Amino acid sequence: MWNPNAGPNPYPPQVVCPGGSNPACPPPLNPAFPPGPCPPGIPQGNPAFPPCRPPYPVPQPGCPGYQPSGPYPPPYPPPAPGMCPVNPPAPGMVGPGIVIDKKTRKKMKKAHKKSHKHHKHGKHSSSSSSSSSSDSD
């Protein structure tokens, strides 16, 4: 089982410090990914993804000045500086992660319909338009 010559503590403390927090013990180096710029020669790491430069343009996550490369025309109108181009949400969606119950959605639909200034012709029109009273001059 345990070595009787090991002393009072049968499990000696670990000599290896993996984190590199001890200045006497530097962190272990990974030979597959050496630190620093790529040396001119054989590419290290995964040959499918060389660490020097990607084989395709990677868009930066920063929004200002982001131009997608490709045959797509620029968005019209161009977004204001400092604002990201935003795709309109699908119908029924309000925003990222926002869920609205049916009652509130119905209210919002009604308010949205009211905001349109189109005259609706039909039996169920609750508002009496003033266009029919124009003959009382």
Curated annotation (Swiss-Prot):
Location of this chain's protein in the cell: Nucleus
What ranges does the record give for the region Disordered, renumbered to this chain?
26-54, 94-137
Reading the lineage from the top rank, the first entry is: Eukaryota
Q: Which GO terms describe its cellular component?
A: nucleus
Residues annotated as signal peptide:
none
Q: Where is the composition biased (Low complexity)?
A: 125-137
Query: What keywords would UniProt list here?
Result: Nucleus, Transcription, Transcription regulation
Q: Is Transcription regulation among this UniProt entry's keywords?
A: yes
Q: Where is the composition biased (Basic residues)?
A: 103-124
Sum up the protein's function in the record's words: Negatively regulates TSP1 expression at the level of transcription. This down-regulation was shown to reduce taxane-induced apoptosis.
This protein's name: Proline-rich protein 13
What is the organism field in this record? Mus musculus (Mouse)
